[in-house]
Structures are given as C-alpha cells and as structure tokens.
Regions:
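C-terminal and inter-domain tail/linker signature
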Residues: 1-128
Length: 128
C-alpha cells in the first residue's frame, strides 16, 4: 500500500470509528501534533482523544497530495445529527512505511465574520 492509500485507509477507519485499526498506520513512537491547541500526543493518546470525542461524525476526504514521504490531506468532519462541521488539514510524514509525524490544523466551519459581510468583501465559495 502506498502512502496515499494508507492515508485514505486511515481516514476510512477514522470515519468508521474502528479504533483498534488505527494503530497499524503509525510507527510505535509516532508523534501527533494538534497545532491549533498546542497539544502533542503519542499514538495511544491520539486514539483515545478521538474515540472519546463526543458525538458521531462522518469524514469526507476533499483533497490529497503526496510529495515523496509526505502526504497532505484536507478533510471535512461533520457531526451527524448536528449542523456542526470542521475542516482539518493534515501533514503525514512517513518513515519505513509508517506515519512517523502527523501535524494537524483544525478549523470550525461557519459563516463569514459580520464585518466582512457588512463591507461586502468576498462571496460564498458555493455561490452558484
């Protein structure tokens, strides 16, 4: 399985909330950083943080790029039975066929700030 396929598999297992399958993608001493909240996890902590996250969600991969041993993904995470959604941009660095380092950047989806709406700066991405 190439790096891109591994990231697709990881997101698929995350979407299914198959927590016992997540470890196989990571090196034993992998580091996972959630940069927005200044948190660093090992694999066990990463799985626990995700498995204990409240609610049920769906994950859709919107973009995937691969540059040598680096895979960059953009996913949309939507909480089922709720209007809440997020986007995550993730940088997966591989070593010896496993994820060695993962840096993730999360953002809440929402409408534009009122000051930009008032000034009529920009328009919705899906305006057609």
């Amino acid at each position: 399985m190439n790096y891109k396929e591994q990231v697709i598999g990881l997101w698929s297992d995350m979407n299914k909330q198959s927590w016992n399958d997540i470890h196989r993608y990571f090196d034993n001493d992998a580091v996972i950083n959630w940069n927005n909240t200044n948190e660093r996890f090992n694999v066990e902590e990463f799985v626990r943080a995700n498995s204990e996250y409240p609610g049920d969600w769906s994950i859709k991969v919107e973009r995937l790029e691969c540059i040598e041993n680096l895979v960059i993904s953009v996913v949309k995470v939507h909480l089922k039975n709720d209007d809440v959604s997020f986007h995550a941009t993730s940088f997966f660095e591989f070593n010896n066929g496993k994820i060695k380092l993962l840096n993730e950047y999360w953002g809440d989806d929402g409408k534009s700030p009122q000051w930009r709406i008032d000034k009529q700066i920009g328009k919705p991405i899906n305006y057609i």
